[in-house]
């Protein structure tokens, strides 16, 4: 029998086995940043929704470069991040076997989009979730018990995490169920953390209070699902020669005769995509503010820069494909991230302490592209397109009734 006379490394990484569909749709934080009591109390993560991608132009200002102020065009991802609502707090005590939940306190009022998450069919349900938990805030005995619970939390707990949910009504989705998550509080003492929660219960927390410009963060998400794929697409194994019997996109040898079973490290066909992944060190290029009123006028210039002063929004012409318009606060991250459009994304503060020039570099954008992402767009704004193309038929039809009325 013939065989190849050279060796080659195996195809595919075994560190992410098993390659099967994720059990959860929202990215789960399995490790939190180390707590530093000297810092003020702050959240360590946030939730957003992937809108799409565009590109930017900026000057690189890293000290030590051979070419100073070199211009670079870079791809960026837009993640829409409406404010989160704080609806509860969980205290954890330290045990020899790790952390254990000690007390859980929910807010007095929970919105329907939050309570929908606890029902499979909200329309047919009796909608009684959290009715007993809410009554504690109204009678005298319940208020006394709540004060005791908060005091016990300050005395015994080592870790404080808040329960937050997203606001689906602010997003261009049909989905009404909010995504709920526990986020750890870092900084300050335990008493200060509990006081932080009490002051912000049932209130909104914006993204700019969690992250800062040019910060390096981690992105946790479930990747885009690809369905059932063959071994060549799933593991990138080499295709067999043209005249191979019964197919080319296969693995010729799947192991020895004995042991009489197929090993776990052998590349096989199966599920590809929809895997839970954590990607480290994503740099924030911009934390943009959503559309808002200022002096009686709507402000939409969250895509303007000091070099490009055009009054334009981050939403490209025609909207982001398969998403729509971004009208809320957003985060612009360098490069691509896991997940498809509208996928919920977990943004976490970095676990590492960064010292590199690239991580500490301050980002100043010169230009943000807002051309249409559906086709080959060449106009940055609708006004620019109309000035170049001239009046369209729909504009002329609007002007006709006005001229007839004046006559």
UniProtKB/Swiss-Prot annotation:
Residues in coiled coil: none
Tissues with expression: Expression is restricted to striated muscles.
GO cellular component: cytosolic large ribosomal subunit
Keyword Ribonucleoprotein: yes
GO molecular function: structural constituent of ribosome
Matching SUPFAM superfamilies: Translation proteins (SSF50447)
GO biological process, any: regulation of striated muscle tissue development
Record's compositionally biased regions (Basic residues): 1-31
Origin: domain of life: Eukaryota
Induction of its expression: Expression in skeletal muscle is down-regulated in response to a hypertrophic stimulus.
Region feature (Disordered): 1-37
UniProt keyword annotations, A-Z: Ribonucleoprotein, Ribosomal protein
Entry-linked PROSITE patterns: RIBOSOMAL_L3
Quaternary structure (record): Component of the large ribosomal subunit (LSU). Part of a LSU subcomplex, the 5S RNP which is composed of the 5S RNA, RPL5 and RPL11. Interacts with NVL in an ATP-dependent manner. Interacts with RRP1B. Interacts with IPO5, IPO7 and KPNB1; these interactions may be involved in RPL5 nuclear import for the assembly of ribosomal subunits. Interacts with RRP1B.
The protein's role, per its UniProt record: Heart- and skeletal muscle-specific component of the ribosome, which regulates muscle function. Component of the large ribosomal subunit in striated muscle cells: replaces the RPL3 paralog in the ribosome in these cells. The ribosome is a large ribonucleoprotein complex responsible for the synthesis of proteins in the cell. Inhibits myotube growth and muscle function.
Family statement drawn from the similarity comment of this UniProt entry: Belongs to the universal ribosomal protein uL3 family.
Protein name as catalogued: Large ribosomal subunit protein uL3-like
Gene: Rpl3l
């Amino acid at each position: 029998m013939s065989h190849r006379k050279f060796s080659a490394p195996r195809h595919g990484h075994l560190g992410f086995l098993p390659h099967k569909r994720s059990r959860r749709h929202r990215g789960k934080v399995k490790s939190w940043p180390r707590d530093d009591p000297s810092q003020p109390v702050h959240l360590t993560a946030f939730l957003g929704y992937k809108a799409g991608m565009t590109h930017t132009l900026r000057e690189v200002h890293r000290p030590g470069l051979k070419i100073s102020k070199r211009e670079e065009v870079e791809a960026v991802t837009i993640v829409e991040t409406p404010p989160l609502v704080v609806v509860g707090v969980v205290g954890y005590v330290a045990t020899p076997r790790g952390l254990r939940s000690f007390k859980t306190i929910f807010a007095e009022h929970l919105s329907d989009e939050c309570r929908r998450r606890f029902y499979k069919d909200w329309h047919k349900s009796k909608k009684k979730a959290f009715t007993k938990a809410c009554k504690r805030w109204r009678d005298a005995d319940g208020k006394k018990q709540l004060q005791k619970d908060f005091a016990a939390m300050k005395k015994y707990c080592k870790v404080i995490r808040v329960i937050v949910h997203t606001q689906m009504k602010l997003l261009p989705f049909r989905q009404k169920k909010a995504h709920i998550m526990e986020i750890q509080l870092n900084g300050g003492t335990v008493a200060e953390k509990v006081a932080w929660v009490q002051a912000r219960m049932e209130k909104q927390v914006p993204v700019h209070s969690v992250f800062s410009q040019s910060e390096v963060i981690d992105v946790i998400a479930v990747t885009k699902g690809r369905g059932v794929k063959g071994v060549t697409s799933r593991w990138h194994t080499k295709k067999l020669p043209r005249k191979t019997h019964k197919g080319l996109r296969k693995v010729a040898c799947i192991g020895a005769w004995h042991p009489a079973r197929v090993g776990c490290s052998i590349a096989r066909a199966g599920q590809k995509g929809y895997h839970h992944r954590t990607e480290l060190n994503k740099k924030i290029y911009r934390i943009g503010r959503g559309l808002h009123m200022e002096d009686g006028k709507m402000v939409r210039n969250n895509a303007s820069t000091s070099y490009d002063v055009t009054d334009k929004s981050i939403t490209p012409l025609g909207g982001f494909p398969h998403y729509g318009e971004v009208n809320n606060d957003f985060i612009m991250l360098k490069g691509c991230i896991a997940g498809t459009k509208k996928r919920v994304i977990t943004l976490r503060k970095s676990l590492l302490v960064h010292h590199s020039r690239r991580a500490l570099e301050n980002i100043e954008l010169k230009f943000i592209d807002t051309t249409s992402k559906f086709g080959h767009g060449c106009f940055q704004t609708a006004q620019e397109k109309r000035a170049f193309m001239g009046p369209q038929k729909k504009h002329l039809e609007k002007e006709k009734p006005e001229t007839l009325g004046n006559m």
